[in-house]
Swiss-Prot record:
Organism: Arabidopsis thaliana
Quaternary structure and interacting proteins, as annotated: Interacts with DREB1A and DREB1B in the nucleus.
InterPro entries tied to this protein: 14-3-3, 14-3-3_CS, 14-3-3_dom_sf, 14-3-3_domain
Pfam families linked: 14-3-3 (PF00244)
Family from the record: Belongs to the 14-3-3 family.
Key words of the record: Cytoplasm, Nucleus, Phosphoprotein
Cellular component, GO, one term: nucleus
Modified residues (Phosphothreonine): T211
Functional note: Is associated with a DNA binding complex that binds to the G box, a well-characterized cis-acting DNA regulatory element found in plant genes.
Identification of the protein by name: 14-3-3-like protein GF14 mu
Source lineage: Eukaryota, Viridiplantae, Streptophyta, Embryophyta, Tracheophyta
Domain of life: Eukaryota
Location of the region described as Disordered in the Swiss-Prot/TrEMBL record: 239-263
């Protein structure tokens, strides 16, 4: 195990990198903390999460843009341009895959085994579910199924721990419910299951809203608003489309189209 001074240095460098928007370096600093095999503090967890979220977020946004343009070119019959876009998308997909593989190894080898409390266990398994979900957004065939299965498994482990250890109003438990419901909507093409999960989380939190401390109030109510926004979007889709089957799109996801998720 590394010294406290070494750990403090890595955390400080991660904060500097964040200020300068150098997110790849932010991630490297926080990976160094993770490799000390310690249970991360709330601040350290958030630094790790923000770093990876920004590193992968720009690529996910690029992939969505290319996917949208590809569909438009295909409709126009511009096969040459479709081929060019597909080649570019493959480059982005490789970058996305490498980022996801990287965080999975850090989670499986260091962060999840070192998690000593319920909050950390929920946080890191939720994170694992998120990054397998990001893989499932662009993978196809057996690779997509495997990513979806692993995402589901991680979200289920996180949910079991959250229900046992965290109150319904806890921002991490709410963020998990938000992202798990997005997984059901976007990846599993199951809007009714997504709505049930989101509504249950929202209703349970509402019933205990008066127990929220001032520190968590802003975070929790923001996620509750996202849950409600997604519910509004999804229930209108269900009534328009006529249920789950209408949302099945040849086993491929429509990333970002299914609602908001948490950081």
């Amino acid at each position: 195990m590394g010294s406290g001074k070494e750990r403090d240095t890595f955390v400080y460098l991660a904060k500097l990198s964040e200020q300068a928007e150098r997110y790849e370096e932010m991630v490297e600093s926080m990976k160094s903390v993770a490799k000390l095999n310690v249970d991360l503090t709330v601040e350290e967890r958030n630094l790790l999460s923000v770093g990876y979220k920004n590193v992968i977020g720009s690529r996910r946004a690029s992939w969505r843009i290319f996917s949208s343009i590809e569909q438009k070119e295909a409709v126009k019959g511009n096969d040459v341009n479709v081929k060019r876009i597909k080649e570019y998308m493959e480059k982005v997909e490789l970058e996305l895959s490498n980022i996801c593989i990287d965080i999975m190894s850090v989670l499986d080898e260091h962060l999840i085994p070192s998690a000593s409390e319920g909050e950390s266990t929920v946080f890191f398994n939720k994170m694992k579910g998120d990054y397998y979900r990001y893989l499932a957004e662009f993978k196809s065939g057996n690779e997509r199924k495997e990513a979806a299965d692993q995402s589901l498994k991680a979200y289920e482990i996180a949910t079991t721990a959250a229900e046992a250890k965290l109150p319904p109003t806890h921002p991490i438990r709410l963020g998990l419910a938000l992202n798990f419901s997005v997984f059901y909507y976007e990846i599993m093409n199951a809007p009714e299951r997504a709505c049930h999960l989101a509504k249950q989380a929202f209703d349970e939190a509402i019933s205990e809203l008066d127990t929220l401390n001032e520190e968590s109030y802003k975070d929790s109510t923001l996620i509750m608003q996202l849950l409600r926004d997604n519910l509004t979007l999804w229930t209108s889709d269900i009534s328009e489309e006529g249920g789950d089957d209408a949302h099945k799109t040849n086993g491929s996801a429509k990333p970002g189209a299914g609602g908001d998720d948490a950081e």
